[in-house]
Amino acid sequence: MQQIRLDSQDGFYLAEPLDTWLTAGQHDFAIPEAGGSSARVFLYKHTSGKTPYSRDPAFKVMRHDKISYAKPLFLEEYNILANLRGVDNLTPMLQAGFLKPDSNTTWPSEIAPLTKQMEKQGQGVNIKGEMALFEVDEIEDVLAQFEERIQDGWLPFLILERRWEDNLYLLCDAGYTRGNFVRNLSMKQVLDISVQICTLLEEAHNRGASFLDHKLLHYYWNEFRQKVIIIDWNIGHWQPN
């Protein structure tokens, strides 16, 4: 476990929101459904521009005003992602931990960063505080400290690989793209995507994880690799026995 500071003046900080918009065909769209009921999600960056991650990841932190509702969801996601390591088509958890925001912290409005001004309004740079950071193989320590940390004002978080691919929801529903399908999928691709999703869910179920939040916006399509990738396991159950 590491104790580090979250501070946009020097070190790691929270940049643009990732939970208010989706991308497809190199275009961004404000999607209200992308917002989570239990967490906020921001781009996690460092002032130096250098991080130990291959690219800037996503920082998913429990909503400070929904703690009672969010607690069981975070517990499920910690357990599921820690135990599904190595499963293909899965967005991996890179690290996890707890954030204790400074007493004067003001959380940003949930605004899609579709302009520079909106990006400035929606970013999390003013969220500062102390972080207890754990590696994935230390997840048992996270679970053991979970209740006590929350009672002491800490908010659980996950650091996840950021999805950059086309969101499958926008490839299949033209409601937000003004009637345009930004990238047509062939029938073969649609069938392949369906098989990949079923194969992933079957393997997860065999390991003890049940996925219960079946929305297209939880899937991304990697055109280059012809691969579908899933996010968001907090609406799920970990039942290894």
Describe each PLM feature range.
Residues 217, 222-241:
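Activation segment/activation loop of eukaryotic-type protein kinase catalytic domains
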Residues 38-83, 90-91, 97-127:
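ATP-binding glycine-rich loop module of kinase domains
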Residues 1-31:
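Juxta-kinase regulatory segment immediately upstream of eukaryotic protein kinase catalytic domains
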Residues 193-194:
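Activation segment signature within eukaryotic-like protein kinase domains
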Residues 197-204:
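Conserved hydrophobic alpha-helix
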Residues 94-185:
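Conserved structural core of kinase catalytic domains
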Residues 205-222:
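Catalytic-loop of the protein kinase fold
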